[in-house]
Amino acid sequence: MTAILERRESESLWGRFCNWITSTENRLYIGWFGVLMIPTLLTATSVFIIAFIAAPPVDIDGIREPVSGSLLYGNNIISGAIIPTSAAIGLHFYPIWEAASVDEWLYNGGPYELIVLHFLLGVACYMGREWELSFRLGMRPWIAVAYSAPVAAATAVFLIYPIGQGSFSDGMPLGISGTFNFMIVFQAEHNILMHPFHMLGVAGVFGGSLFSAMHGSLVTSSLIRETTENESANEGYRFGQEEETYNIVAAHGYFGRLIFQYAGFNNSRSLHFFLAAWPVVGIWFTALGISTMAFNLNGFNFNQSVVDSQGRVINTWADIINRANLGMEVMHERNAHNFPLDLAAVEAPSING
Protein backbone atom coordinates (compact mmCIF):
# COMPACT_ATOMS: atom_id res chain seq x y z
CA MET A 1 0.00 0.00 0.00
CA THR A 2 1.38 3.34 -0.99
CA ALA A 3 0.46 6.46 0.95
CA ILE A 4 0.68 9.75 -0.88
CA LEU A 5 1.18 12.69 1.42
CA GLU A 6 0.58 16.19 0.11
CA ARG A 7 2.43 18.85 2.03
CA ARG A 8 0.17 21.82 2.68
CA GLU A 9 1.86 25.14 2.19
CA SER A 10 2.06 27.03 5.41
CA GLU A 11 -0.50 29.81 5.51
CA SER A 12 0.88 33.32 5.63
CA LEU A 13 0.60 35.48 8.72
CA TRP A 14 -1.77 37.81 6.85
CA GLY A 15 -3.97 34.89 5.84
CA ARG A 16 -4.21 33.67 9.42
CA PHE A 17 -5.04 37.21 10.55
CA CYS A 18 -7.81 37.48 7.95
CA ASN A 19 -9.29 34.14 9.00
CA TRP A 20 -9.19 35.11 12.67
CA ILE A 21 -10.75 38.53 12.05
CA THR A 22 -13.63 37.09 10.02
CA SER A 23 -14.18 33.90 12.03
CA THR A 24 -17.64 33.46 13.52
CA GLU A 25 -16.20 30.95 15.99
CA ASN A 26 -14.60 33.68 18.14
CA ARG A 27 -16.31 34.44 21.44
CA LEU A 28 -16.75 38.01 20.23
CA TYR A 29 -16.92 38.62 16.49
CA ILE A 30 -14.38 41.20 15.34
CA GLY A 31 -14.83 41.60 11.59
CA TRP A 32 -13.24 44.16 9.32
CA PHE A 33 -15.45 46.90 10.72
CA GLY A 34 -14.27 45.86 14.18
CA VAL A 35 -10.67 46.57 13.19
CA LEU A 36 -11.62 50.26 13.01
CA MET A 37 -14.35 50.16 15.66
CA ILE A 38 -12.18 48.90 18.52
CA PRO A 39 -9.47 51.61 18.45
CA THR A 40 -11.91 54.47 17.78
CA LEU A 41 -14.32 53.53 20.58
CA LEU A 42 -11.46 52.82 22.99
CA THR A 43 -9.98 56.24 22.20
CA ALA A 44 -13.33 58.02 22.61
CA THR A 45 -14.08 56.22 25.88
CA SER A 46 -10.63 56.78 27.37
CA VAL A 47 -10.52 60.48 26.54
CA PHE A 48 -14.10 60.93 27.77
CA ILE A 49 -13.31 59.39 31.16
CA ILE A 50 -10.10 61.39 31.60
CA ALA A 51 -11.68 64.67 30.45
CA PHE A 52 -14.83 64.17 32.55
CA ILE A 53 -12.66 63.74 35.61
CA ALA A 54 -9.86 66.23 35.06
CA ALA A 55 -10.25 68.54 32.02
CA PRO A 56 -9.72 72.25 32.79
CA PRO A 57 -12.44 74.83 31.96
CA VAL A 58 -13.16 75.50 28.27
CA ASP A 59 -13.75 78.86 26.58
CA ILE A 60 -16.85 77.56 24.80
CA ASP A 61 -18.15 80.94 23.54
CA GLY A 62 -14.72 82.23 22.52
CA ILE A 63 -15.04 85.31 24.76
CA ARG A 64 -12.40 84.43 27.36
CA GLU A 65 -14.99 83.18 29.86
CA PRO A 66 -14.15 79.50 30.43
CA VAL A 67 -16.85 77.07 31.56
CA SER A 68 -15.95 74.26 33.96
CA GLY A 69 -17.13 70.75 33.14
CA SER A 70 -14.99 68.21 34.97
CA LEU A 71 -15.30 66.63 38.40
CA LEU A 72 -11.99 68.02 39.68
CA TYR A 73 -13.12 71.54 38.81
CA GLY A 74 -16.19 71.53 41.04
CA ASN A 75 -18.81 69.49 39.18
CA ASN A 76 -20.71 66.34 40.12
CA ILE A 77 -22.07 63.52 37.98
CA ILE A 78 -25.20 65.54 37.14
CA SER A 79 -23.61 68.91 36.35
CA GLY A 80 -20.40 67.56 34.79
CA ALA A 81 -19.87 67.38 31.03
CA ILE A 82 -17.30 67.46 28.27
CA ILE A 83 -17.59 71.10 27.17
CA PRO A 84 -17.87 71.55 23.37
CA THR A 85 -14.96 72.95 21.38
CA SER A 86 -14.64 76.75 21.49
CA ALA A 87 -16.48 79.01 19.06
CA ALA A 88 -13.03 80.48 18.33
CA ILE A 89 -12.18 77.17 16.63
CA GLY A 90 -15.47 76.98 14.74
CA LEU A 91 -15.54 73.99 12.40
CA HIS A 92 -11.77 73.74 12.03
CA PHE A 93 -10.23 70.31 12.43
CA TYR A 94 -8.44 70.72 15.76
CA PRO A 95 -6.18 67.81 16.67
CA ILE A 96 -3.58 68.20 19.41
CA TRP A 97 -0.78 69.00 16.96
CA GLU A 98 -2.70 72.02 15.60
CA ALA A 99 -2.50 73.77 18.98
CA ALA A 100 0.57 75.61 20.24
CA SER A 101 0.46 73.57 23.45
CA VAL A 102 -1.63 70.97 25.22
CA ASP A 103 -2.85 73.70 27.59
CA GLU A 104 -4.15 75.72 24.64
CA TRP A 105 -5.79 72.60 23.17
CA LEU A 106 -7.56 71.91 26.46
CA TYR A 107 -8.59 75.57 26.89
CA ASN A 108 -10.19 75.54 23.43
CA GLY A 109 -12.06 72.29 24.09
CA GLY A 110 -10.04 69.99 21.86
CA PRO A 111 -11.12 66.83 23.74
CA TYR A 112 -14.76 67.34 22.66
CA GLU A 113 -13.92 67.22 18.96
CA LEU A 114 -11.60 64.25 19.49
CA ILE A 115 -14.25 62.30 21.41
CA VAL A 116 -17.11 63.10 19.04
CA LEU A 117 -15.28 62.27 15.81
CA HIS A 118 -13.88 59.00 17.18
CA PHE A 119 -17.27 58.11 18.69
CA LEU A 120 -19.15 58.68 15.43
CA LEU A 121 -16.62 56.60 13.51
CA GLY A 122 -16.89 53.89 16.16
CA VAL A 123 -20.68 53.62 16.21
CA ALA A 124 -20.81 53.67 12.40
CA CYS A 125 -18.34 50.77 12.38
CA TYR A 126 -20.42 48.99 15.04
CA MET A 127 -23.38 49.25 12.66
CA GLY A 128 -21.24 47.88 9.83
CA ARG A 129 -20.05 45.07 12.12
CA GLU A 130 -23.67 44.12 12.81
CA TRP A 131 -24.27 43.83 9.08
CA GLU A 132 -21.01 41.92 8.57
CA LEU A 133 -21.81 39.32 11.24
CA SER A 134 -25.36 38.94 9.91
CA PHE A 135 -23.96 38.38 6.41
CA ARG A 136 -21.49 35.73 7.56
CA LEU A 137 -24.19 33.87 9.50
CA GLY A 138 -26.62 34.00 6.58
CA MET A 139 -29.02 36.29 8.43
CA ARG A 140 -31.03 39.18 7.04
CA PRO A 141 -29.54 42.69 7.50
CA TRP A 142 -32.30 44.36 9.52
CA ILE A 143 -30.38 44.52 12.83
CA ALA A 144 -27.95 47.02 11.31
CA VAL A 145 -30.83 48.90 9.69
CA ALA A 146 -32.55 49.28 13.08
CA TYR A 147 -29.29 50.46 14.68
CA SER A 148 -29.00 53.14 11.99
CA ALA A 149 -31.67 55.15 13.84
CA PRO A 150 -29.58 55.98 16.95
CA VAL A 151 -26.51 56.38 14.71
CA ALA A 152 -28.40 58.95 12.64
CA ALA A 153 -29.58 60.74 15.80
CA ALA A 154 -26.05 60.92 17.23
CA THR A 155 -24.66 62.12 13.91
CA ALA A 156 -27.33 64.82 13.75
CA VAL A 157 -26.60 66.38 17.16
CA PHE A 158 -22.82 65.90 17.17
CA LEU A 159 -21.92 66.63 13.54
CA ILE A 160 -24.72 67.87 11.26
CA TYR A 161 -26.02 70.49 13.70
CA PRO A 162 -22.57 72.01 14.36
CA ILE A 163 -21.92 72.10 10.60
CA GLY A 164 -25.21 73.91 10.00
CA GLN A 165 -24.61 76.39 12.83
CA GLY A 166 -20.98 76.97 11.87
CA SER A 167 -19.21 75.78 15.02
CA PHE A 168 -18.64 72.70 17.15
CA SER A 169 -19.45 74.93 20.13
CA ASP A 170 -23.12 74.47 19.15
CA GLY A 171 -22.87 70.67 19.44
CA MET A 172 -24.47 68.81 22.32
CA PRO A 173 -22.29 68.74 25.47
CA LEU A 174 -21.34 65.27 26.68
CA GLY A 175 -23.09 65.20 30.03
CA ILE A 176 -26.49 65.04 31.72
CA SER A 177 -27.19 68.72 32.42
CA GLY A 178 -25.36 69.63 29.20
CA THR A 179 -27.85 67.55 27.25
CA PHE A 180 -30.75 69.35 28.94
CA ASN A 181 -29.14 72.72 28.21
CA PHE A 182 -28.78 71.71 24.55
CA MET A 183 -32.47 70.77 24.42
CA ILE A 184 -33.61 74.04 25.99
CA VAL A 185 -31.45 76.20 23.73
CA PHE A 186 -32.53 74.17 20.69
CA GLN A 187 -36.16 74.85 21.54
CA ALA A 188 -35.45 78.56 22.03
CA GLU A 189 -33.66 78.94 18.70
CA HIS A 190 -35.53 76.47 16.48
CA ASN A 191 -38.95 75.86 18.08
CA ILE A 192 -38.41 72.11 17.75
CA LEU A 193 -41.61 71.26 19.65
CA MET A 194 -43.58 72.70 16.72
CA HIS A 195 -41.66 70.72 14.09
CA PRO A 196 -43.62 67.79 12.61
CA PHE A 197 -40.53 65.57 12.39
CA HIS A 198 -39.96 65.94 16.13
CA MET A 199 -43.62 65.04 16.69
CA LEU A 200 -43.08 61.87 14.65
CA GLY A 201 -40.04 61.08 16.79
CA VAL A 202 -42.06 61.48 19.99
CA ALA A 203 -44.71 59.17 18.54
CA GLY A 204 -41.97 56.69 17.64
CA VAL A 205 -40.35 56.64 21.08
CA PHE A 206 -43.50 56.68 23.20
CA GLY A 207 -45.40 54.47 20.78
CA GLY A 208 -42.51 52.02 20.68
CA SER A 209 -42.49 51.90 24.49
CA LEU A 210 -46.24 51.30 24.55
CA PHE A 211 -46.14 48.57 21.90
CA SER A 212 -43.17 46.89 23.58
CA ALA A 213 -44.99 46.85 26.92
CA MET A 214 -48.19 45.58 25.29
CA HIS A 215 -46.37 42.81 23.44
CA GLY A 216 -44.33 41.73 26.45
CA SER A 217 -47.32 41.68 28.76
CA LEU A 218 -49.50 39.80 26.26
CA VAL A 219 -46.84 37.13 25.71
CA THR A 220 -46.13 36.81 29.43
CA SER A 221 -49.85 36.48 30.12
CA SER A 222 -50.40 33.76 27.53
CA LEU A 223 -47.45 31.45 28.25
CA ILE A 224 -48.07 27.75 27.75
CA ARG A 225 -47.80 26.26 31.24
CA GLU A 226 -45.05 23.63 31.47
CA THR A 227 -44.43 23.78 35.23
CA THR A 228 -46.31 23.29 38.46
CA GLU A 229 -47.82 26.13 40.46
CA ASN A 230 -44.85 25.98 42.81
CA GLU A 231 -42.29 26.69 40.07
CA SER A 232 -41.57 29.76 38.03
CA ALA A 233 -43.25 29.73 34.63
CA ASN A 234 -39.87 30.69 33.16
CA GLU A 235 -38.53 27.24 34.09
CA GLY A 236 -40.85 25.76 31.48
CA TYR A 237 -38.77 27.12 28.61
CA ARG A 238 -35.70 25.42 27.18
CA PHE A 239 -33.36 27.36 24.93
CA GLY A 240 -33.78 26.25 21.33
CA GLN A 241 -37.02 24.34 21.86
CA GLU A 242 -39.15 23.83 18.76
CA GLU A 243 -42.52 24.25 20.47
CA GLU A 244 -44.18 27.64 20.81
CA THR A 245 -43.65 29.08 24.25
CA TYR A 246 -46.86 31.11 24.25
CA ASN A 247 -50.29 30.86 22.68
CA ILE A 248 -50.47 33.55 20.00
CA VAL A 249 -54.10 32.63 19.26
CA ALA A 250 -55.07 33.34 22.87
CA ALA A 251 -53.13 36.62 22.86
CA HIS A 252 -54.72 37.65 19.56
CA GLY A 253 -58.19 36.76 20.82
CA TYR A 254 -57.70 38.73 24.04
CA PHE A 255 -56.46 41.82 22.22
CA GLY A 256 -59.17 41.61 19.59
CA ARG A 257 -61.87 41.56 22.27
CA LEU A 258 -60.16 44.28 24.29
CA ILE A 259 -60.08 46.79 21.41
CA PHE A 260 -61.57 45.43 18.17
CA GLN A 261 -61.15 42.32 16.06
CA TYR A 262 -58.44 43.50 13.68
CA ALA A 263 -56.41 45.55 16.18
CA GLY A 264 -54.04 42.65 16.88
CA PHE A 265 -51.60 40.89 14.57
CA ASN A 266 -52.27 37.30 13.56
CA ASN A 267 -48.79 36.94 12.06
CA SER A 268 -45.86 36.82 14.46
CA ARG A 269 -43.39 37.93 11.79
CA SER A 270 -45.29 41.03 10.73
CA LEU A 271 -45.87 41.84 14.41
CA HIS A 272 -42.16 41.85 15.20
CA PHE A 273 -41.36 43.83 12.06
CA PHE A 274 -43.85 46.45 13.24
CA LEU A 275 -42.30 46.52 16.73
CA ALA A 276 -38.90 47.23 15.15
CA ALA A 277 -40.02 49.61 12.41
CA TRP A 278 -42.20 51.97 14.48
CA PRO A 279 -39.51 53.46 16.75
CA VAL A 280 -36.81 53.24 14.07
CA VAL A 281 -38.79 55.28 11.55
CA GLY A 282 -39.73 57.79 14.27
CA ILE A 283 -36.10 58.32 15.28
CA TRP A 284 -35.09 58.58 11.62
CA PHE A 285 -37.52 61.46 11.26
CA THR A 286 -36.21 63.15 14.41
CA ALA A 287 -32.64 62.93 13.11
CA LEU A 288 -33.84 64.38 9.81
CA GLY A 289 -35.60 67.18 11.69
CA ILE A 290 -32.44 68.05 13.65
CA SER A 291 -30.49 68.02 10.39
CA THR A 292 -32.89 70.46 8.71
CA MET A 293 -33.15 72.74 11.75
CA ALA A 294 -29.34 72.79 11.75
CA PHE A 295 -29.68 75.02 8.69
CA ASN A 296 -32.46 77.05 10.37
CA LEU A 297 -35.45 75.45 8.65
CA ASN A 298 -37.29 75.66 11.95
CA GLY A 299 -40.57 74.49 13.48
CA PHE A 300 -43.92 76.06 12.67
CA ASN A 301 -44.52 79.62 13.85
CA PHE A 302 -48.14 80.29 14.79
CA ASN A 303 -47.38 83.36 16.93
CA GLN A 304 -50.28 85.84 17.13
CA SER A 305 -52.14 83.94 14.42
CA VAL A 306 -55.60 84.36 16.00
CA VAL A 307 -57.14 87.84 16.12
CA ASP A 308 -60.64 89.16 16.83
CA SER A 309 -62.73 91.39 14.57
CA GLN A 310 -60.93 94.47 15.90
CA GLY A 311 -57.50 93.05 15.10
CA ARG A 312 -56.64 92.33 18.72
CA VAL A 313 -54.52 89.23 19.31
CA ILE A 314 -56.18 86.30 21.05
CA ASN A 315 -53.33 84.35 22.59
CA THR A 316 -53.04 80.64 21.86
CA TRP A 317 -50.69 78.03 23.25
CA ALA A 318 -48.36 78.89 20.36
CA ASP A 319 -47.96 82.36 21.88
CA ILE A 320 -47.22 80.87 25.29
CA ILE A 321 -44.49 78.71 23.71
CA ASN A 322 -43.14 81.80 21.92
CA ARG A 323 -42.90 83.70 25.19
CA ALA A 324 -41.04 80.78 26.78
CA ASN A 325 -38.70 80.63 23.78
CA LEU A 326 -37.85 84.32 24.16
CA GLY A 327 -37.14 83.85 27.86
CA MET A 328 -34.87 80.87 27.24
CA GLU A 329 -33.04 82.70 24.46
CA VAL A 330 -32.45 85.70 26.70
CA MET A 331 -30.89 83.53 29.39
CA HIS A 332 -28.51 81.37 27.38
CA GLU A 333 -25.03 82.64 26.48
CA ARG A 334 -25.94 85.75 28.41
CA ASN A 335 -22.43 87.21 28.18
CA ALA A 336 -21.86 86.43 24.51
CA HIS A 337 -24.35 89.02 23.24
CA ASN A 338 -26.31 92.00 24.47
CA PHE A 339 -29.67 90.84 23.13
CA PRO A 340 -30.89 87.73 21.37
CA LEU A 341 -31.59 88.35 17.70
CA ASP A 342 -35.35 88.06 18.25
CA LEU A 343 -35.29 90.87 20.81
CA ALA A 344 -32.80 93.09 18.99
CA ALA A 345 -35.09 93.73 16.03
CA VAL A 346 -36.05 97.27 15.05
CA GLU A 347 -39.62 96.65 16.13
CA ALA A 348 -40.12 94.57 19.26
CA PRO A 349 -42.58 91.69 18.88
CA SER A 350 -45.87 92.30 20.63
CA ILE A 351 -46.55 89.85 23.45
CA ASN A 352 -49.90 91.00 24.82
CA GLY A 353 -51.30 92.49 21.65
UniProtKB/Swiss-Prot annotation:
Belongs to the reaction center PufL/M/PsbA/D family. NCBIfam families: psbA. The gene is psbA. PANTHER family: PHOTOSYSTEM II D2 PROTEIN (PTHR33149:SF12), PHOTOSYSTEM II PROTEIN D1 (PTHR33149). The record marks 190 as: Stabilizes free radical intermediate. Fe cation binds at residues 215, 272. This is Photosystem II protein D1. Tyr-161 forms a radical intermediate that is referred to as redox-active TyrZ, YZ or Y-Z. C-terminally processed by CTPA; processing is essential to allow assembly of the oxygen-evolving complex and thus photosynthetic growth.
